[in-house]
Curated annotation (Swiss-Prot):
A Pfam family the protein falls into: Late_protein_L2
Family assignment from sequence similarity: Belongs to the papillomaviridae L2 protein family.
Tree of life domain: Viruses
Function: Minor protein of the capsid that localizes along the inner surface of the virion, within the central cavities beneath the L1 pentamers. Plays a role in capsid stabilization through interaction with the major capsid protein L1. Once the virion enters the host cell, L2 escorts the genomic DNA into the nucleus by promoting escape from the endosomal compartments and traffic through the host Golgi network.
Keyword Phosphoprotein attached: yes
PTM annotation, UniProt: Highly phosphorylated.
Organism listed in the record: Human papillomavirus 69
Residue pairs linked by disulfide bridges in the UniProt entry: 21-27
The protein's name: Minor capsid protein L2
Subunit and interaction comment: Interacts with major capsid protein L1. Interacts with E2; this interaction inhibits E2 transcriptional activity but not the DNA replication function E2. Interacts with host GADD45GIP1. Interacts with host HSPA8; this interaction is required for L2 nuclear translocation. Interacts with host importins KPNB2 and KPNB3. Forms a complex with importin alpha2-beta1 heterodimers via interaction with the importin alpha2 adapter. Interacts with host DYNLT1; this interaction is essential for virus intracellular transport during entry.
InterPro entries xrefs: Late_L2
Entry GO MF terms: DNA binding; structural molecule activity
Amino acid sequence: MVAVRASRRKRASATDLYKTCKAAGTCPPDVIPKIEGSTLADKILQWSGLGIFLGGLGIGTGTGTGGRTGYIPLGGGGRPSVVDIGPTRPPIIIEPVGPTEPSIVTLVEESSIIQSGSPFPNFSGGDGFEVTTSSTTTPAVLDITPSPGTVHVTSTNIQNPLYIEPPVDIPQSGEALGHIFTSTSTAGTHSYEEIPMEVFASNTSSGSKPISSTPIPGIRRVAAPRLYSKAYQQVKVTDPNFISKPSTFITFDNPAYEPMDTTLTFSADSHVAPDPDFLDIIALHRPALTSRRGTVRFSRLGQKATLKTRSGKQIGAKVHYYHDISPIHATEEAIELQPLITSEQHSTPLFDVYADADPAPTFTFPSTTPTTIPRFSSTIFSTTSSAPLNVTIPLSTSFDIPIYNGPDIYAPVPSSTWPYIPPPPTTMSHSVVAQGGNYYLWPYIYLIHKRRRKRVPCFFSDGLAAY
């Protein structure tokens, strides 16, 4: 059995032990010298203080607070503390109150006593009011005509240049240097205001004056959003609902209406994201449409709240969510071609080429009867006139496609009833013209000697064959 060692309990501080053990005399030997300042270090400082002055430096074995007066910075003495003492107030004289006095506050004097049943005062006057009577019934008319007063009229002339009418000038005539100038009257009223105009900018200006009030140097371009920097985490969203309902990737609620061009905010503690790529998202910023590598891309920036400090600040990464809508350029699709003529159709013309006749001199040919043309003949007869005609040009002269003289060319339709006719043997004839008048040979060609490669025979038989 392994013995369990008891944990060591920490001893109380020297100050607490000194308070309890000093009176009982049970203090450890190191407590009393430390509290009373009688250790060896304290004694050394006391002995050294007999020869030098160490006051105010705070050198001791205490707590290191600099003593009672604190530390004094080097290079200057301590500044004595100044206490402002106001003027002395006069002393308040206290009047002693004897035990026989009723109260400190002076009492109110007694009022007269009103007795009930006292007689009313009797007023006796000598002369009363004088009443005057009259028998005249004429109404009294008062003359209230006001006295004539004095009227003072004051006039003041104020000159305002905005409302001064132009003076009336009589037309005058004058003569100078043989030319007669006639002035017109400036009097009268006008329904418009004549203001001298000045041309600020025109196409015929010399260019010395600026056209705009504040010319902008260079070209100012709107900075594009830097969505593909290292500060953003790139996440591709394949679900097309990210365009119309982005909140369904973060919360389980499905609102009836979501704004498309606003920033969406969410609470970090009130939901669990259905999509793990949208975990801890607290904000989805307004969308942006960009073109990236030949596609139209729908982008939104998201802010995550992964950590939260005690002060309430949320820290998280910024994520760039994007969804590729469609490619800008249409992809090439392979289209299967269908035959234009089947075995049942023979009337549809193919390879019909229309051209205008060359305005060359007209040649007249005698009328000929229809001539039977061999099947594999490549001769084509046509008539030429001054009017444009329909000229048919064959596209091939192989053995499998017959050539007919007519307005149209029809594609051959194979049939099982046709017998197989083998092609006749052909002989290739070559004709070389030695002399001609439409070209000449350059004499320098005969002076140029072609450099021949010297053959080195490897064997005796090869040398005989080479020579």
